């Protein structure tokens, strides 16, 4: 601001000087220029300016003085004034350079100052604002009665936990009597959505890997009427590259395009190049590009990842199963190596089978992209294993993601709607569990509903809630299983929804924000990893407002036991600064922001670290105990909707097998 104010004073003085011909006789200067410019392509314009020198003198004086005042006051639209100054300088350099050659040096100094001021403008933090929301958001209480139906005394299956896992498990039963117990007011766990003027927006999970024929996900979507309702990000994904990170990696970019020369024939590539250098000059923080334009840079990594496609035989499935094409030895080999070492420290790798050997050299830009992709899932590139890391990179970086209106909340809503029409299933919210007591003929489950005590008898139980408190309810679990559960990591993540007075980026899914690490900001450990567009997800809403969703995951190494639980307003202001920078980069002022809501999900995402899949941590943790079976992300070790659905289906199949065995025993005894 010191330089900006200094030049603001100089502009004001220059404007005042136009009133004193003894300092600068503008009409005479313009007449001299008109003579010197004869025969040039701009001669006519120069002659016109010379003929109206007195008016031009007054106009220029007012403009210079006014722009100086603007530089001093520094309103939000100062950027436009600086661009106007640059345009005026360019015009007068063209007109005067022959008759007054010293103008090139003088205006060159002012142009450099203008570019410096532009950089400051694009990186300025907005003044703190107050917003209607002043605390972390919570799921909207259900408008329904607490009782979805009168409860019976006995059930074939009781499911504890009404998140995506529990609801999926319930949907697998067609004849058995099923009761789903949920402690909160709404079902869906971390897969929910809210609305803003009819526009659905996610409050937790957003997207999932594109399902392929025969997959559990596609079968579930078909069951609940959502097959074909999702949108793919294949052609609509943007990447927000930090400008100076991209500039530092220019050599890597050039090499990538030299290896893929056909891309040099695309006008969009040259447009991206121009955008990079322009943004580097004027200081815009991001270079925004379609994801496909980065393909040459990531070509070596993509070629390697294509060997592990979900549609092929060598996909690194989670959980690992012995009937897959990955041998246990190969899985254990990669699960005991960090992804960072595997991809970016080739000198530390021992001998690897040829099909598992990664590219010999991957650049810094690729490293940042890989790190950002995994960080969105609360995974640290140094902590996650190569096996688990490959699973995510194949699906989330190389593959296509799909989403529904409101994100994964549409899946939970679809499951609830489906189950509400199943006469064998009862959904019960507002439940507080008080006891789980195994008995000779099943298990007695005691709980309260809005403070009123109830109990039911269950032949089989599916525990679809997180396993963190299992020791309290099931102290008889084997010590090995309890130890495995204790070793499972759960990480915090935050999600911010920014409500706008008009739609923004509605043509795009949004995308990753690839930036270097910075510890200067107070919440650098909770920075935005993606900026997603609710209007694109819910494109049938046809509303005149917008919502941008910022995923703000945390990793254990960055978080270092810090939390924003009691610092909502500070985190909200940091989020405001983040989204204002994104909007300013695309030419939109922060005044379009109406509110910022933030959702805090403590211990909301399961992560798998080096060695845990090889050691069988999650396999041990999910082992059935007597008539109790387990379903949740922590049964798989992957924090996404696919693992929640898979674990729900697996638990339901285990229950069906147990019930069938019980029926067979009864028939034999009879």
Curated annotation (Swiss-Prot):
Its cofactor is FAD. One of its GO terms (molecular function) is oxidoreductase activity. The chain crosses the membrane at residues 53-73, 76-96, 98-118, 238-258. One of its GO terms (cellular component) is membrane. It is found in: Membrane. Residues 1-19 form the signal peptide. Disruption phenotype: Cells lacking this gene show a white phenotype and produce 4-hydroxy-2,2'-bipyrrole-5-carbaldehyde (HBC), 4- methoxy-2,2'-bipyrrole-5-carbaldehyde (MBC) and a dihydro form of MAP (H2MAP). Keywords: Antibiotic biosynthesis, FAD, Flavoprotein, Membrane, Oxidoreductase, Signal, Transmembrane, Transmembrane helix. Pfam families: Amino_oxidase (PF01593), DUF6041 (PF19507). It is a multi-pass membrane protein. SUPFAM superfamilies: FAD/NAD(P)-binding domain (SSF51905). Its EC number is 1.-.-.-. It is an enzyme of class 1 (oxidoreductase). Pathway: Antibiotic biosynthesis; prodigiosin biosynthesis. GO terms for biological process: antibiotic biosynthetic process. It comes from the Bacteria. Involved in the biosynthesis of 2-methyl-3-n-amyl-pyrrole (MAP), one of the terminal products involved in the biosynthesis of the red antibiotic prodigiosin (Pig). Catalyzes the oxidation of dihydro form of MAP (H2MAP) to yield MAP. Belongs to the flavin monoamine oxidase family. This is Oxidoreductase PigB. It comes from Serratia sp. (strain ATCC 39006).
